[in-house]
């Protein structure tokens, strides 16, 4: 197989990450992630770079965003990778609809595209005539899992709020659905639900306002750990130790919080392995393997102090 050569490296919002010295026989994989201010994606990048070094048979070029709402950077990255003629694009989309048209153009250019972590919107794919598999976790099931852990502690009638992720991201919608599933199953009362766009400081401000409006809150369901950290900071500032918090992602920052009880639980979706796994899928297709179809599930695990 003759692989296309990469003309230039792709800029990351926090600097320039160029792949290893390129060889004629190495395929070039463009990795498009979300915010590198988020520990989850920092770990993902580290895992992907380690995987590149371990395999040694592909060149990685990785792009991240400055913030979780910096969708234009992702779109520009895809367009840049198309112009550069990479062999594969592996993407965790920040917006499940907005990225479909540029990814369609990539596929039309003969580039293998792997959608991982955050699924693309099914309606948008149908509208654009795109058939693309998803490699990633059960976000709804994971949120239900951690939500059930909170419900078990609070008991029926427990009063909770939801801190949502980006409205345009399918995994945010799925995690909200999972939280709502847990609320219904556990007989909890939902007092409020609003987005903090995956961001720590925004979650801090949002939850501070929620707590003022609803001082009777007993539990918080945060759609990612970065926002859970913001909630914990708000609770510490308010001097409240009676409110239970759960998150999603199992980033390193929450380990001590789970150990000392500031965070009840989170969901590990093994972010450090996620991009590496998606890259492997892309390389299998490039090597002549079958086209991926449907949903290729990756692992999740409930993480508690026990």
Predicted feature locations:
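A residue-level marker of the well-folded mature domains of exported/periplasmic proteins
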Residues: 2-7, 23-306
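Sec-dependent N-terminal signal peptides
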Residues: 6-15
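Hydrophobic alpha-helical membrane context
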Residues: 16-17, 46
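Sec/Tat signal peptide C-region and signal peptidase I cleavage site
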Residues: 17-23
């Amino acid at each position: 197989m003759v692989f296309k050569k990469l003309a230039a490296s792709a800029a990351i919002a926090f600097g320039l990450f160029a792949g290893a010295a390129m060889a004629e026989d190495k395929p070039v994989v463009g990795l498009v992630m979300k915010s590198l201010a988020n520990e989850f994606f920092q770990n993902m990048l580290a895992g992907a770079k380690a995987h590149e070094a371990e395999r040694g048979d592909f060149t990685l070029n990785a792009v991240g965003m400055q913030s979780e709402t910096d969708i234009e950077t992702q779109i520009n990255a895809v367009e840049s990778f198309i112009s550069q003629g990479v062999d594969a694009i592996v993407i965790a989309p920040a917006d499940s609809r907005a990225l479909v048209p540029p990814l369609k153009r990539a596929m039309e250019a003969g580039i293998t595209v792997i959608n991982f972590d955050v699924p693309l919107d099914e309606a948008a794919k149908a509208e654009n005539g795109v058939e693309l598999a998803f490699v990633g976790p059960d976000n709804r099931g994971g949120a239900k899992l951690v939500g059930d852990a909170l419900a078990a502690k609070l008991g029926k009638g427990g009063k909770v709020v939801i801190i949502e992720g980006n409205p345009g991201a399918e995994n945010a919608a799925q995690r909200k659905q999972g939280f709502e599933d847990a609320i219904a199953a556990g007989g909890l009362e939902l007092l409020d639900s609003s987005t903090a766009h995956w961001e720590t400081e925004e979650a801090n401000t949002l939850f501070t306002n929620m707590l003022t409006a609803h001082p009777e809150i007993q539990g918080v369901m945060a759609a990612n750990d970065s926002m859970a950290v913001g909630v914990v900071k708000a609770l510490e500032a308010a001097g409240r130790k009676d409110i239970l918090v759960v998150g999603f992602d199992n980033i390193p920052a929450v380990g001590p919080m789970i150990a000392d009880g500031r965070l009840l639980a989170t969901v590990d979706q093994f972010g450090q392995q996620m991009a590496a796994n998606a890259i492997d899928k892309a390389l299998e297709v490039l090597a002549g393997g079958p086209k991926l179809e449907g949903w290729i599930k990756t692992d999740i695990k409930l993480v508690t102090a026990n």
